[in-house]
Amino acid sequence: MQKSGVNRNPSLKVAIPQAQQSLRRLGFCSQIATGGSQQSSPIVFPEKRNKKVKASSRRGEVTNDPQVKPKPDEHRIDIGGGDEKSDLLGSLVYAGKLVLDKRKSASGKDATEIQQPAATDISIKKAVDAKLTSSALVWGSDMLQLNDVVSVTYNVGLRHFTVHAYPIGKGSCGLSCFTKPKRSRKDFRFVAPTVEEAVQWVASFGDQQCFINCLPHPLVAKKQASSELFSVPIDTPPELVFRCKSAPKMLVILNPRSGHGRSIKVFHNVVEPIFKLAGIKMEVVKTTKAGHARELASTVDINLCSDGIICVGGDGIINEVLNGLLTRSNPKEGVSIPIGIVPAGSDNSLVWTVLGVRDPISAALSIVKGGLTATDVFAVEWIHTGIIHFGMTVSYYGFVSDVLELSEKYQKRFGPLRYFVAGFLKFMCLPKYSYEVEYLPAQKEDAEGKIRLEKEAVDMQDLYTDVMRRSSREGFPRASSLSSIDSIMTPSVGELDTCSSTHASTEPSEYVRGIDPKMKRLSSGRRDVTAEPEVIHPQAQSTTPNWPRTRSKSRMDKGWMGLTSVQDPPTRCSWGNTGGQDREDISSTVSDPGPIWDAGPKWDTEPSAWDVENSIELPGPPEDIETGLRKQSITPIFEDKWVSRKGHFLGIMVCNHACRTVQSSQVVAPNSEHDDGTMDMLLVHGCGRLRLLRFFILLQTGRHLSLPYVECVKVKSVKIKAGKNTHDSCGIDGELFALHGEVISTMLPEQCRLIGNAPGRHS
């Protein structure tokens, strides 16, 4: 009976799940082990088999449903359909049938054969379900990320199209644990059932910001006989006309010395083919001297690089291009030109940190995909000379700047290892560094993530009541005052092109000092006061004692002199983002409490009847603040916000972002972001080799901030002055400068745009 039952239903053995079979075997063995009677086994087996047959029949009925086809005892993970909330591939763009043609390129075949590529392809090769989502192309069990796709090539009138991509290749089984995955070019040739479906597929790729290279029919390209051209489509399908984007124009500035001379090979062998696939029109210029990239960026015709400037090299060439763009005759043009980065140097901290790109192929793909990432810029101004230099990564003083200076001697001999050699030599003969540091702390954020404004002494309601009381007696100001206030908040092109006085002042420029928006309103309202000679009180610390501290010019003359004087672009340029000024506080200190000069003309030249003793006054010396309670109540006290540090420092680093190094674990400023409007200042207090060695050892693992002598502060402006017997040098984004006197670093929010989309915030 048992044998006949098994023979009649041979499929039962396959239908029974493995888990249930093991349970039945255990039950059968337990019966034999317990010495059960033989008459129990023929009674038990038919009942269990009948139940299993019924269960299998029910399962067969369920699987016959065309909508639900679950397999028994199988875990399913639906990543493309079903529940929309569990869709991991984004929204659906287009779906249909496709066949992957794995044959080699048919470029050498006859055009007629290309026109009908193996008419039996669809019948012989089974077409699979394919769909294009906002994140990937899925066909069968294969998937291709859209971030890896460069372009799509399509010949008019054909059923096939080619997808050009650079996916991450899988290493061999034995070496995959030791080698990093690399990207390589792969061309996927798909065949659609009809020409119309092929056009729809290509148009869908165009909707996902993929470059469409639409070519004419092969017969038209080869100029076949006119009799054959009557049946050949010539015009581009209307679905693809608007998807075919115009070729972007970019200027490529290549530093042939970057990366120990390998930047040329990286560009021509790796990056240039990707740009050509994407249809980018390039003009490649190789730098020949220091500062060549800055000259190109400051004088290049904007029509030649309307879509951006690509920098191939390290952080040094990027810094030159940035300073060239921001010192153009029209600064608005400089801000509008984005910068693309291809890492090919020994240090590329900017692109590693902001865009999360570490290899040239990924950098080229991010440039091809487009997108813009706004980045803050900091300005370093030399107070004595008025020279301004911009940066986007970090400015450093002390041991690191000395290592940078010493490494220039070993650049040709050691290449990227020159920093290690110079650091070791400088470590063995470590000097003592002393600095005077004053910084303006950034405003803290509350629990809701909004900036919490500090309580100020100005009561705007009382100020409004006071102004209305005087206006009822003297009349409202003229309508031109509104335009004057608006001109301060949004400077015109003419104002942007102007620079400051030819004589270098001891005070920082307006946007470097970070004037507060309320102070601008107060100064704008004070312009109706009669022009009077002003006397600046002598200060405790005068940076230039040879210059007299008395000025007989009126506020009007002083303001216009700063706006109309013309000087070289790099020196005391008054250009700056007003949005960045509005977010910053005034940077006057106790040691330098001079008044704020009005930067605009007076509204009236005739005397006004306003009470001079009750006029709205700007912050003045401490003697003026103590003269009356009313003046003290309406004058913001910004001197108390500045914090001073003086003593020995092994190093001072002012970071604009996290500043990741070659090793991903090395993060100089973990809490800094490229677009938060603040800078992170690291102070390494003290002196001695042991402290310096501990700092660099813990820097390898990102635990250097736990040291008791390391201080990290978020700041908006920093003043640094080297002490006596201290080697006065500083580095800005890998460029070395001499530190003569005091310098001030100030943040300019979102004054540069990088080509590419930034990933999520780094933890």
UniProtKB/Swiss-Prot annotation:
In terms of InterPro entries, this protein maps to:
ATP-NAD_kinase_N, Diacylglycerol_kinase_cat_dom, Lipid_Phosphate_FormReg, NAD/diacylglycerol_kinase_sf, YegS/DAGK_C
UniProt: ATP binding residues: N255, P256, R257, T287, E320, G345, S346, D347, R418, D733, G734, E735
Where the record annotates domain DAGKc, the positions are 245-384
This protein's GO CC annotations: membrane
Top-rank taxon of the source lineage equals: Eukaryota
Q: In which tissues is it expressed?
A: Expressed in roots, stems, leaves and at higher levels in flowers.
Task: Using the record, list the residue span of the signal peptide; answer none if the entry has no such feature.
Answer: none
| GO biological process, alphabetically ordered | sphingolipid biosynthetic process
Q: Which residues form the active site?
A: D315
Q: Which UniProt keywords apply?
A: ATP-binding, Kinase, Nucleotide-binding, Transferase
Tell me what turns on expression of this protein.
Not induced by low-humidity stress or by abscisic acid treatment.
Statement: the UniProt record of this protein carries the keyword Cytoplasm: no
Q: Which cysteines are joined by disulfide bonds?
A: none
| Residue positions binding substrate | G313, G314, D315, G316
Give TM regions.
Answer: none
Give a yes or no for keyword GTP-binding in this entry.
Answer: no
Q: Ranges of Basic and acidic residues compositional bias?
A: 58-81
Enzyme nomenclature, EC number: 2.7.-.-
Matching entries from PROSITE patterns are given as: DAGK
Q: Where do the segments described as Disordered lie?
A: 34-81, 561-603
Q: Which residues form a coiled coil?
A: none
Q: What is the top EC class of this enzyme, as a single word?
A: transferase
> What job does the chain carry out?
Involved in the production of sphingolipid metabolites. Active on sphingosine, phytosphingosine (PHS, 4-hydroxysphinganine), D-erythro-dihydrosphingosine, D-erythro-sphingosine and trans-4, trans-8-sphingadienine, an LCB found exclusively in plants, but not on N-acetyl-dihydrosphingosine (C2-dihydroceramide) and D-threo-dihydrosphingosine.
State the protein's name.
Sphingoid long-chain bases kinase 1
Native species: Arabidopsis thaliana
Lineage, highest ranks first = Eukaryota, Viridiplantae, Streptophyta, Embryophyta, Tracheophyta
